[in-house]
Amino acid sequence: MQFVLVLNCGSSSLKFAVMNPTSGDVLLNGTAERLGHDVGSLTVKDESGKAVQEIKPGTHAQALELIVETLKTKNLMDKIAAVGHRLVHGGEFFKESVVINNEVREKVAECIRLAPLHNPANITGIEAALKVFPKLPQVGVFDTAFHQQMPEKAYLYPLPRKFYEEFHIRRYGFHGTSFRYIASQLESVTGLKNPRTVVCHLGNGGSLAAIKDGHSVDTTMGLTPLEGIVHGTRCGDIDPAIIQILQKQFHISATEMNEILWKKSGLLGLSGISNDCRSLEEAMAEGNEAAIRALEVYCYRLAKHIAAQMVALNGCDALVFTGGIGENSAFVRANTMEQLAFLGFELDKKANEETSRGKQGKISTANSKPVWVIPTNEELLIARDTAQLSGMTR
C-alpha cells in the first residue's frame, strides 16, 4: 500500500498528514508550530494518541526532518509515494492542480507580490520537501484554482483597467480546495443534481462561495484573504478610506496598519477578548457585552454575504456550513439563518444543536430551503489530486 504525504506550510507552522488517497484513512498527522522562533514544537498524532517534541531552532527544514524521523520510526517512510502541497495563491497561472517543476516554482514565486504573507512559506515548504524527498513527485494544489472560472463581472474591481491588465489586480478567492471538496459531495449528500449552493466555510479565516454546476461563480474573498466576512483576526470588508484616516490620525506606519488589519481586527478586535468563537460564546453566555456585540456583527455580516451570493446564483437550492465554526457552532448557524427567514430558511432547533464534532446532516425543517452541515476534508482532496497526477491512481 502506498500513501501520500500532505503538507500545509504556513509562515510559522507546518501541518502534515500521511493519507491513503483511496480510502481517506489518516495513518499519521501533526503540526509543527512556532517555526522561526528559538524553539518550536512538533505534535504528532496516530492511533495510539499524540506526542510532542521540541524543535531547535525551529525552522521548516528541521521540522520536516523531524517528521521524516517519525515516519521512519513508524515504518512509513518507504510507503510514501508522493508529496502534496497546499499552495495558497496561484494567480491566473493555475486553474487546476499541477506537478511541481521549476516552471511551477517560478510562477509561485511570481505570485509572492499577490500573497506576501503566504506564498513565501509555501515555497519554503516545497524547497524543504524537495531536499528530503528528491525522487518523489511533488504536486501543488492551489486555494485560488477553483475560483478561476468566475465570470469577469465577479472578479473585476472597479479600478482603472490598467491595474488589472498590467498587474493582475483582481478578485481571486481562497478556500478553493474546501469548496471543491464540498462541491464533489453535494449530489450524494443532498440528493440534488447540480444544486445552486451557497457554501459557508467558516473558521478563523472564513469565506463563502456560490457554486453552480459544480463551479464557483462568485466568492467573498478577493485579491487577498482579507476581504469578505468578519474573520477571527482579519477585518473583512471595510471602507478603504479608513486606512489613510487612521494612519494620519494616529501616525501609524504601513507595516503597523497591516498588522492591525490582519492580526488585530475581526472577532478579536470587536470583542477585545479572543478570536476564538468558542471563547466568545462562553463569554456571551456569562453576559459579556463585548462578546455579544462581536458575535452579532459576525452573524449579521455573514447573513448579508449569504444573501449576496444568492444573487450570483439567481436563487438557491441548498446552503452548506463547513469549516471549524460552520461545523461546530450551532449558535452562529441559528443566529445567521434567523436573519434569512424571509428568504425561506428555517432551522430545526434539535437537528442544529445535535450536529457538530464531525457530524454531517440536514439541519433545516421540512418546509425550509435545505441547509446542511458537511464536514470538509481538504487534505483528502489534496491527497487524491496528488495520487492522480503522480500516477498512483488512474
Swiss-Prot record:
Recorded hits in SUPFAM superfamilies, A to Z, give:
Actin-like ATPase domain
CDD domains (alphabetical) = ASKHA_NBD_AcK_PK
Q: In which pathway does it act?
A: Metabolic intermediate biosynthesis; acetyl-CoA biosynthesis; acetyl-CoA from acetate: step 1/2
Where are the active-site residues found?
143
Q: Could you say which residues bind ATP here?
A: 15, 201-205, 276-278, 324-328
- Show the PROSITE patterns listed in the entry: ACETATE_KINASE_1, ACETATE_KINASE_2
Q: Where in the cell is it found?
A: Cytoplasm
- Sequence positions that bind Mg(2+): 8, 378
Required cofactor names: Mg(2+); Mn(2+)
The reactions it catalyses are: acetate + ATP = acetyl phosphate + ADP
Mainly resides where? cytoplasm
Name of the molecule in the record:
Acetate kinase
Q: Which organism encodes this protein?
A: Dichelobacter nodosus (strain VCS1703A)
Reported EC number(s) for this entry are: 2.7.2.1
- Enzyme class, broadest EC rank: transferase
One of its GO biological process terms is: acetyl-CoA biosynthetic process
Keywords (A to Z) from UniProt: ATP-binding, Cytoplasm, Kinase, Magnesium, Metal-binding, Nucleotide-binding, Transferase
The cofactor note from the UniProt entry for this protein is: Mg(2+). Can also accept Mn(2+).
InterPro entries for this protein: Ac/propionate_kinase, Aliphatic_acid_kin_short-chain, Aliphatic_acid_kinase_CS, ATPase_NBD
| MF GO annotations | acetate kinase activity; ATP binding; magnesium ion binding
State the similarity comment: Belongs to the acetokinase family.
GO CC, sorted alphabetically, is: cytosol
PANTHER family in alphabetical order:
ACETATE KINASE
UniProt-listed Pfam families: Acetate_kinase
Cite the record's note on assembly: Homodimer.
According to its UniProt entry, what is the function of this protein? Catalyzes the formation of acetyl phosphate from acetate and ATP. Can also catalyze the reverse reaction.
> Where does this protein hold substrate?
86
The organism's taxonomic lineage, starting at the top: Bacteria, Pseudomonadati, Pseudomonadota, Gammaproteobacteria, Cardiobacteriales
